[in-house]
Amino acid sequence: MDQQKIPQATAKRLPLYYRFIQNLSLSGKQRVSSAELSEAVKVDSATIRRDFSYFGALGKKGYGYNVNYLLSFFRETLDQDDITRVALIGVGNLGTAFLHYNFTKNNNTKIEMAFDVDEEKVGKEIGGIPVYHLDELEERLTNDIQVAILTVPANVAQAVADRLAYTSVHGILNFTPARLNVSEKIRIHHIDLAVELQTLVYFLKNYPQ
């Protein structure tokens, strides 16, 4: 299957499916229906079947989906056997939380290093991860580091993103409120926690369950 032809909305749901299939496999379950998947991941059955259809016949009508087959398929599709090495930039409260968490439920993603300008943090380890001065950014980001997490103050986010264009980084997960302009070689995902919270509150008030 040509990955370019898969809708981005479908691609964003694949890790969600994979996480649930992993849990099913660990529990010893052998097969699962689209209805069970729907209930667990809160995506309607029709959408799940359509998502899966982009990859061919993953299941059988009346039987559902073989859990081990799905696990193997999604592991390969999501490159779960390849390690994604990550750098975190900005070791404030949120950044520190990321360093302690370090994707403990995702064995193929690992924060390898962090950067900050606070002399009390530079040269130390947080969660077992070394913290370097931001001045060392270009020197430290080698070809092994593909993704950067930005948890810096909004007023310096663009400057940091500009510098990342000259490193091995090809993806940025931006947790700042700033909307960044990046080079074509970099894909950026914005996660504004304040906006997400405001959206949730709006839905709670206007679309009560």
From Swiss-Prot:
Q: Which Pfam family, giving just one, matches this sequence?
A: Put_DNA-bind_N
Cellular-component GO terms for this entry: cytoplasm
Q: Which residues form the signal peptide?
A: none
Q: What is its main location?
A: cytoplasm
Q: Where in the cell is it found?
A: Cytoplasm
Q: Which GO terms describe its molecular function?
A: DNA binding; DNA-binding transcription factor activity
* Single biological process term from Gene Ontology: negative regulation of DNA-templated transcription
Q: Which residue numbers delimit the DNA-binding region? A: 16-55
Q: Which UniProt keywords apply?
A: Cytoplasm, DNA-binding, NAD, Repressor, Transcription, Transcription regulation
Which amino acid positions bind NAD(+), per UniProt?
A: G90, V91, G92, N93, L94, G95
Keyword check for Cytoplasm: yes
Identify the InterPro entries for this entry. Answer: CoA-bd, NAD(P)-bd_dom_sf, Rex_DNA-bd_C_dom, Tscrpt_rep_Rex, WH-like_DNA-bd_sf, WH_DNA-bd_sf
State how it assembles: Homodimer.
PANTHER family per UniProt: REDOX-SENSING TRANSCRIPTIONAL REPRESSOR REX (PTHR35786), REDOX-SENSING TRANSCRIPTIONAL REPRESSOR REX 1 (PTHR35786:SF1)
Q: Name the family.
A: Belongs to the transcriptional regulatory Rex family.
Q: What does this protein do?
A: Modulates transcription in response to changes in cellular NADH/NAD(+) redox state.
Name of the protein this chain belongs to = Redox-sensing transcriptional repressor Rex
- Lineage of producing organism: Bacteria, Bacillati, Bacillota, Bacilli, Bacillales
Gene encoding the protein: rex
